[in-house]
Amino acid sequence: MQIHFTLNHKKTAAEIAPDTLLIDLVRSLGCKSVKCGCETANCGLCTVFLDEKPVLSCSVLAARVDGRSVTTLEGLQEEAAEFGAFIADQGAEQCGFCNPGFIMNALALFREKPDPNEEEIKEYLAGNLCRCSGYEGQLRGIQNFLAWKKSKETAQ
């Protein structure tokens, strides 16, 4: 079946089988930041934005994106690089395999709750599994990024 959608701000068409998963489609189109970690919608590595909302692409049929907008980390490079520097500064990147999904969910958090407290941050990111870190570095990175962003906005 033929589908038409927007991928990272570009109109895209693809021929897919009815059982094709979104993760497989976006990876076949060159979006390698979308990782497959569990195939059970439990790890957060496959997070993408579907119409600006985070979804786990391993649990979404590609046919459901027809006429919609999909954004991966490749489509958010400037925003992701700005935030990613704060994660790296806290030594929270470790092996880096989980970073794309973690960054996508953190960016979704910032959009939904511009000034979250620590509990809201932990709750929002609970679906991201990282086998290398204790999550404290990620939490500090988020808090430092939010403080920097707030001071930047205040200065303007």
Question: Which residues does each predicted region cover?
Answer:
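Signature of N-terminal electron-transfer/Fe-S-associated modules in redox systems
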Residues: 1-156
